[in-house]
Amino acid sequence: MNDLIESLKEIGLNSYEAKVYVALLKKYPATGYEISKLADIPQSRAYDTLKALENSQIVMSSNTKPVTYTPIKPKELTKRYKRKITS
């Protein structure tokens, strides 16, 4: 799993973003609280990170209560990264 986090950091995600994305791949949809526990990061940091990932369109949020989050597929993330490099 550390290799995956390092790979995500190489494509531009910071440490928290990589941990949150990996946690979401393991369990989705998930709440911010669940993600903070899975990623082993502070809950407040999880919500900040989820917002940043949502703004980058790497994570989508629901319009439910509680809000749940879903990651984009890894293939889509890879495709976006390749497009970014070639442009």
Predicted regions and their residues:
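A short acidic, leucine-rich amphipathic alpha-helix
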Residues: 34-39
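Short, cationic-aromatic polyanion-contact patches
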Residues: 6-17, 31, 58-84
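Alpha-helical DNA-recognition elements
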Residues: 49-56
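Short alpha-helical "packing" element that flanks the helix-turn-helix/winged-helix DNA-binding module
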Residues: 17-24
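Long, low-complexity, charged/polar intrinsically disordered regions in eukaryotic proteins
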Residues: 1-5
